[in-house]
Amino acid sequence: MTADTETNVVEVDARGLRCPEPVMLLHGAIRRSPVDGLVRLIATDPSTQRDVPQFCRFLEHELIDSEADDAGDLHSFLIRKRG
């Protein structure tokens, strides 16, 4: 996990990890972030496309952006922590 100091985005690199590890790492990063803090999750597990939006809805965080590379092998999610 790294922090981009220019934009205050915490980056969670979950490449190579399988369910449920990417969401567990995301949950930990969100818990440590301040309200309105941004967390970017980068993952290769295709189940994150289903799990991350559900995680955000369930815990009422804002999914700002969701992208996949052209091959669909790399997934990126930008989440804003809500109060």
Where do the protein language model's features map onto the residues?
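Amphipathic, hydrophobic secondary-structure cores in small proteins
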Residues: 12-68
